[in-house]
């Protein structure tokens, strides 16, 4: 009798979605430098549970502007890699800003090029928001605004990143009296030399709930009077709302015409510093008592505050920076070119300044305060 033939059924294991995508890419496109990841293929109806096609690494995501950028990216269904140096408890608020598994947190060292490469190797967008208002023993302005951005841009270029967005400042200039603004101007030049297609964002002073602009002046209530160089009549400011800056940055990740351009983000109105601070105290229902202080005296006081081992109230550089008038960007595209309508200061300032009011004024309406006087120069 012939031997019985037995057939053995072998069950094939299902392939994961990344494996299918990688296999399809290798078949139809051949071997490539960077394999196509399923996260860069947009699908869904929009929102946090869809896929926007953006895989973004956001340096400086734990800062003031960073949380808004991460929130906008997560809201439209992007994967976000968040390098951090702080304690894990300081990034907990970011975990809720994206769908399950869409946010990846990665410890990094700003001076370790390998950790930078690891943070950007899977991204098609890299956003640099790293900034600091004062120098420390570990990082001075040259490190923060020149060396680190150059290293990130270099790693992004080597990794084949499609879009690199670098945030600077509207008044960045090699001739500025502020060391931080001079360093930011050098940083722009270094980034552009390493990554010519980089998108550079130059916002004016940014205001929002956690800012160091409106809150800084409002906190002068503890000193009973506000020192201003020339009483603030020689300084013009054009502050911009933080959510507008965030939307502009996110829109720049998708705009094909934004590549290689420099954008100036400003608010719709310009104010003399005197009228702006007067409006801040009017919103908080506090008595506004300004007094003139020479710049060299104010800078010397800021230098003394800067010697504090803790977060300084002010510094010599900040005194100089807040008394520099915002330039009028006539030749640079702005928020409108990225589909964002700038928000007037008067509409959002109550969100920032309400906490500075005394208890009996907490429920008063915004209309009770006279708007700040604007200028056209």
From Swiss-Prot:
Organelle transit peptide: 1-35
One of the record's GO molecular function terms: NADH dehydrogenase activity
Residue numbers of N6-succinyllysine PTMs: 175
Compartments (UniProt record): Mitochondrion matrix
CC annotations in GO: mitochondrial inner membrane; mitochondrial matrix; mitochondrion; respiratory chain complex I
PANTHER family: NADH DEHYDROGENASE [UBIQUINONE] 1 ALPHA SUBCOMPLEX SUBUNIT 9, MITOCHONDRIAL, NADH-UBIQUINONE OXIDOREDUCTASE 39 KDA SUBUNIT-RELATED
UniProt protein name: NADH dehydrogenase [ubiquinone] 1 alpha subcomplex subunit 9, mitochondrial
């Amino acid at each position: 009798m012939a031997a019985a033939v037995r057939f053995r059924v072998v069950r094939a294991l299902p392939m994961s979605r990344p494996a299918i995508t990688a296999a399809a890419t290798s078949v139809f496109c051949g071997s490539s430098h960077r394999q196509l990841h399923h996260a860069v293929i947009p699908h869904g109806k929009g929102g946090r549970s869809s896929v926007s096609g953006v895989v973004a690494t956001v340096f400086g995501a734990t800062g003031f502007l960073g949380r808004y950028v991460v929130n906008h990216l997560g809201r439209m269904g992007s994967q976000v890699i968040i390098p951090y140096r702080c304690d894990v408890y300081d990034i907990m608020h970011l975990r809720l800003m994206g769908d399950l598994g869409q946010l990846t947190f990665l410890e990094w060292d700003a001076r370790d090029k390998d950790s930078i490469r690891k943070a950007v190797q899977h991204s098609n967008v890299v956003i640099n928001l790293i900034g600091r208002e004062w120098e420390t023993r570990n990082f001075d302005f040259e490190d923060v605004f020149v060396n680190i951005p150059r290293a990130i841009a270099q790693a992004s270029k080597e990794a084949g990143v499609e879009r690199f967005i670098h945030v600077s400042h509207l008044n960045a200039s090699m001739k500025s009296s502020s060391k931080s603004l001079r360093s930011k101007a050098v940083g722009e030049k270094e980034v552009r030399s390493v990554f010519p297609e980089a998108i550079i964002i130059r916002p004016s002073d940014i205001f929002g709930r956690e800012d160091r602009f409106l809150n800084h002046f409002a906190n002068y209530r503890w000193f009973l009077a506000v020192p201003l160089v020339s009483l603030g009549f020689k300084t013009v400011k054009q502050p911009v709302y933080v959510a507008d800056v965030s939307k502009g940055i996110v829109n720049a990740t998708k705009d094909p015409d934004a590549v290689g351009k420099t954008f100036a983000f400003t608010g719709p109105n310009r104010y003399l510093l005197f009228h702006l601070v007067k409006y801040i105290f009017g919103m908080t229902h506090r008595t506004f008592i300004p007094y003139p202080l020479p710049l060299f005296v104010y800078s010397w006081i800021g230098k003394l505050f800067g010697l504090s081992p803790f977060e300084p109230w002010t510094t010599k550089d900040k005194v100089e920076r807040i008394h520099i008038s915002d330039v009028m960007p006539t030749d640079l595209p702005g928020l409108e070119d990225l589909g964002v309508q700038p928000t007037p200061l008067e509409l959002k300032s109550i969100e920032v300044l309400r906490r500075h009011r005394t208890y009996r004024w907490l429920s008063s309406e915004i209309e009770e305060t006279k708007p700040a006087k604007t200028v056209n120069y």
